Amino acid sequence: MQLINISDTVHKLILNDQEIILIGTAHVSQNSVEEVKNIIETESPDRVCIELDDGRMKSKTEKKSYENMDIRKVIKEGKGFFLLANTALASFQRRMGAQTGTKPGEEILGAAEVAKNAGIPVSLCDRDIQTTFKRAWAKSSLWNKCKLLATLISAAFSNEEITAEELEQLKSQDTLQTLMQEMAKELPMVKEVLIDERDQYLGRSIFEAPGKKKVAVIGAGHTQGVISTIESLSEGKQTPTLDNLTIVPKGKPIGKVFSYLIPMLIVL
């Protein structure tokens, strides 16, 4: 693999049978929004890959209100983690947007819109957020499960302003990655699930997406991990498959109790 660093945020990966232009964006920067649009229009790729999963894409584009959500359906479908994680992210993003004037993740949706207008197929390359939390949950002890819930609930309902120092740091990361890192500090035993696996999943999804020339838009915090994964795949090294990274181990009965409590905590 040949790696060409076009800038601090744009990297070209030249492989045997494909070319990947990787854009590591700052999710709270207007410059990132314009950069993504310009690169897609200039490069005219045959595929655009973005750092979203199907559930988060729908939550961003359909603008569903939690107030109108059928909580019984959420419980029945076992989507408590998804609801709590999205509540935490939405809260965090609102606080960031209020202080920066830019809606976090706008460049990701912008990439999808530019691609759609140009007739370019889009691949959603991130792992389902619920799968990530369920895998982390399965690796946690009862005490760590409580800490995981506490971290998510705290993020979901916090009104604390982000400091200037924290804001500068966030400009080089994406909000979900920041949330994952925060939980990894509290739960080092599941760092592999929260951080490393997600980089591997993104890297493999981008590598395996159809197309000879692809533009991939991801948070800057993922860049090195994704490049490393793609390099390993291009060299034929053994790396986890997407199926391996989405298997959710069967949980203990106590886990089901928590999954019922999560949506109840949100609406109470």
Predicted feature locations:
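Compositional signal for N-terminal targeting/processing segments
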Residues: 1-268
